[in-house]
Regions:
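Structured mid-to-C-terminal alpha-helical surface segments
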Residues: 1-47, 56-66, 70, 74-298
Length: 298
């Protein structure tokens, strides 16, 4: 097993070299090793990686908000809390070469009520890297679809540990789910991360318009969400002082390295997704190609 003190020093050096906060890097390392344990367990095929930690991997140094938890889609596995607790007791009990210690007496599984049709679960546990205490939180959703199919990926490592090999969301489904959340929450939306993530993706990944359109249609239909009204694109939405304050608070909390104005973020998302949504409303196919370098459809 690796020496905990040595690992901490290497992580501190990594943080210094990359101008990152040390505690953030400790958290990323623990989440990375958590995913590794899932990937070598008997439950690897039951989970699909999604959310902020997936974007952190896809865009590496270009994804500039810190991520503090893991988001998974569960399939062909029980969404009952006691059953999931038994699953993660087994996952966290595995012996691995890294120095992370999980305190099994702190393992908790609770219901998440925000999911529409199927209740989700939150798995939480305390991990220790030497004497440094790092909370681990895993949100697991159920019942969603991934279009195109999920992809197999190798999760990059901060040091030279064995990498996690897991299934992950397609980027199209990632955008579709985040946009559906924006639309369905409407005026009550306080999830700033969805706006930030879509805006970030639009500047870093070229997109096939047909695939993106299909993913949005599948996701919205599956969640019974319509395309008629998008409150976030109304003129007054981004000008609301409380919402702008929440946005600034989100950027600060997540240690975003390149902050952008909320109005600019909304305008970018509109430019990115409005043509696709308009085609859906008119029952037309959309076949453009998104050029992330100039943030425009071709």
């Amino acid at each position: 097993m690796r020496n905990a003190t040595s690992v901490k020093e290497r992580l501190k050096n990594y943080a210094k070299k990359n101008n990152r906060i040390v505690q953030d890097i400790f958290t990323v390392y623990v989440l990375e090793r958590t995913l590794y344990r899932i990937s070598v367990s008997d439950y690897r095929d039951k989970f699909t990686l999604k959310g902020g930690i997936l974007l952190y991997v896809l865009f590496a140094e270009y994804f500039t908000r810190s991520t503090t938890d893991i988001d998974l889609l569960g399939a062909k596995i029980s969404n009952e809390a006691e059953n999931m607790k038994a699953v993660f007791e087994e996952i966290f009990s595995q012996e691995c070469d890294d120095p992370i210690v999980f305190r099994m007496d702190t393992l908790k599984v609770s219901n998440i009520t925000e999911f529409k049709e199927y209740h989700g679960l939150n798995v939480s546990i305390l991990a220790f890297l030497d004497r440094t205490r790092i909370p681990v939180s895993i949100d697991i959703g159920f019942g969603d679809i991934v279009y195109p199919d999920r992809v197999e990926m190798e999760y990059p490592t901060l040091l030279d540990d064995d990498p996690a090999k897991m299934y992950a969301y397609s980027i199209e489904s990632t955008i579709a789910e985040k946009f559906e959340a924006i639309v369905s929450l409407g005026e009550a939306n306080g999830r700033m991360k969805d706006f930030y993530d879509i805006c970030s993706i639009s500047g870093k990944r070229d997109m096939d318009g047909a695939l993106l359109q299909a993913a949005i249609i599948e996701t919205f239909h599956h969640r019974n969400t319509g395309f008629e009204e998008i409150v976030a694109f109304d003129e007054g939405f981004c000008e609301d002082p409380l919402r702008a304050s929440r946005w600034r608070g989100f950027l600060k909390q997540k240690n975003v390295l390149a902050p952008i104005d909320f109005t600019d973020a909304i305008e970018t998302i509109q430019k990115f997704l409005n043509p696709v949504i308009q085609a859906i409303r008119e029952d037309n196919s959309f076949s453009g190609t998104w050029d992330s370098a100039i943030r425009a459809w071709k």
